[in-house]
């Protein structure tokens, strides 16, 4: 895990999406963060030890979805499906489908499995699934402020977690979508889809994949106006836990929490949320094949040396 000392930090991103404004300052106590997203290998150990069954593996009930036809009450999850030809980008249902039998053990559906994917990030995890793993591991999910602080790596004013150029000196720094979205990812960055963890350079804290690959759950409820609330105070908010309730005006009846980091499906053609200060959101019972998580735990006294082994790293003081 990476350790951070308590410090003041910038959150938000100008010139992208309204919910990332205004840019504001927060104060975050020191904490430890997993160096990578939780992998299939790690999640499998948890599932075997506890017998835990994820939401995507459970058959929905009529009580949960009283208006749904019985034939639609089938376990599964949401899977990205490339469009056969260029399509307007105003309706994501053109490239997403509900796949029966898709879950973390079968990322693309019943015919897929985890063979050779042990080091890939676990996906198709809903918020409660991620929380269950974190509790078992003696950790928790990061707050949105903690995630952005860690992603910035002790640096302020950057567009990306690594700097201000998307491809410095022509180098790919994260797993994002290359090619014509949503038709074909040409894999110019080395991966035509999801990748194993830690395939790109870590940030200055020794943390991997805080941009791209898979979105990551944060503990905060989502509200598009939350940053406005924080900015009204005259001093930096200390360890902001997020708003007390969820509200998304686009889907006001759904309870959503924050996603961060973007994914292998993010592209400048459609979604640029691999930028370090941008925000995502997701309904709490829903997973997909581009959504995972990592964990944190309290910690102080970071030292200025790197100590990376397995899924841990020591992060220098800012």
Regions found by a protein language model. Name each.
Residues 31, 46-55, 137, 302:
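Short capping motifs at secondary-structure boundaries
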């Amino acid at each position: 895990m990476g350790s951070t000392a308590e410090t003041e930090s910038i959150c938000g991103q100008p010139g992208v999406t309204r919910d990332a404004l205004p840019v504001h300052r927060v104060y975050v106590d020191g904490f430890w963060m997993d160096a990578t997203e939780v992998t299939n290998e790690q999640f499998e150990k948890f599932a075997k030890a506890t017998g835990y069954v994820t939401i995507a593996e459970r058959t929905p009930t009529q009580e949960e979805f009283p208006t749904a036809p019985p034939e639609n009450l089938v376990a599964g999850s949401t899977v990205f499906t490339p469009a056969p030809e260029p399509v307007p980008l105003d309706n994501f249902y053109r490239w997403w489908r509900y796949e029966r039998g898709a879950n973390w053990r079968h990322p693309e559906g019943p015919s897929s499995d985890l063979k050779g994917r042990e080091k890939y990030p676990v996906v198709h995890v809903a918020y409660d699934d991620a929380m269950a793993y974190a509790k078992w591991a003696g950790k928790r999910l990061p707050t949105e402020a903690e995630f952005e602080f860690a992603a910035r790596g002790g640096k302020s004013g950057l567009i990306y977690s690594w700097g201000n150029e998307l491809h410095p000196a022509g180098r790919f720094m994260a797993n994002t979508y290359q090619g014509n979205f949503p038709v074909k990812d040409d894999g110019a960055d080395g991966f035509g889809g999801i990748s194993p963890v830690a395939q790109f350079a870590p940030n200055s804290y020794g943390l991997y994949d805080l941009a791209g690959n898979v979105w990551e759950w944060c503990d905060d409820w989502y509200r598009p106006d939350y940053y406005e609330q924080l900015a009204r105070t005259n001093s930096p908010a200390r360890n902001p836990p997020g708003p007390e309730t969820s509200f998304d005006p686009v889907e006001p009846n759904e309870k959503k929490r924050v996603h961060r980091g973007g994914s292998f499906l993010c592209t400048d053609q459609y979604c640029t949320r691999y930028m370090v200060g941008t925000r995502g959101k997701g309904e709490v019972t829903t997973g997909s094949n581009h959504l995972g998580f990592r964990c944190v735990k309290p910690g102080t006294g970071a030292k200025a040396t790197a100590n990376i082994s397995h899924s841990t790293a020591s992060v220098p003081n800012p």
